[in-house]
Amino acid sequence: AELNRRLADMNRELEASNDFLARISSKISHYLAPQIYKSIFSGQRDVTIHTERKELTIFFSDIKDFTSTTEHLQPEEITLLLNEYFTEMSAIAHNHGGTVDKFIGDALVIFFGDPETKGTVEDARACLNMATEMQRRLAELNVKWRRAGTEQPFRVRMGVNTGFCNVGNFGSMHRMDYTAIGAEVNLAARLQSIAEPGHIVISYDTYVLVRDIVAARALPEISVKGIGRMVVPYVVEGVLDEAGRKIEIFSEHMTGLDFYLDPRAVDATAIERIRATLRNAIAALEGRGGEDASAGTARPDQMDPGL
């Protein structure tokens, strides 16, 4: 009886210890990308300073004019918006197999190809599919935030590059960061910096991997520190359907207007309703134009040609 009692006590202590470790590991998981957490706690990866050379597709994004966009908001409001934005974007990245590297202020860094990969081509395609889905979701969030009283929408720039990088644990034995470094990472950041708000700019190395799923236009070549070649960026102008035809996505957000149209997502039964809504909106704008003219707005032929 005494032995059974001791065994029962030991089992309870063991269960309590396991529960404690499970809670701790669950908390730690929020500080790591899911793929990194899984590889460490499954024993597939050691927690040592070690890097590998791999071909990755790297994604950078930031919010254009974030400071001026949020200057009228309180810090608590900015925190809520950013956390919701990062939560939504991170979920999309995870669904497409991306590893969320880090958050830098309002910027987001993601890479494809480590620790899990489907091959260079599929990794690049997954990254572009992720980026376009992020654009769609951000358009929905901007509508939601505007209705909640946020005057200025988030206008996001995105840059994507594919190339060889060093990826793994960097830092010291006391504090490590699992990340990717190299000139190709810097190029992705540079492409993001030249993108117009609402657009995705990709390198030629990425373009050749995804040109069957996106329509893109070449921009003037640029030079990037650390890369001994001129780089030709491409701006993504839309996605392609199975027949290779470009599908345009329309998005515009400003005071008095929240407009987003993805023809692929429209149900056939809703097409006529959408057409009627657009016709009514145009008629309302034309009526507003007449009101402005009657109120003294100058006609085009009366305007100063120097303006």
Q: How would you label these PLM feature ranges?
A:
Residues 31, 43, 118, 134-137, ...:
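Conserved, well-folded catalytic cores of nucleic-acid-processing
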Residues 37, 41, 83-87, 188, ...:
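Short amphipathic alpha-helical segments
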Residues 92, 96-126, 140-183, 208-213, ...:
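Catalytic core of nucleotidyl cyclases, primarily class III adenylyl/guanylyl cyclases
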Residues 161-162, 170, 183-204:
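Catalytic/regulatory signature loops of cyclic-dinucleotide turnover enzymes
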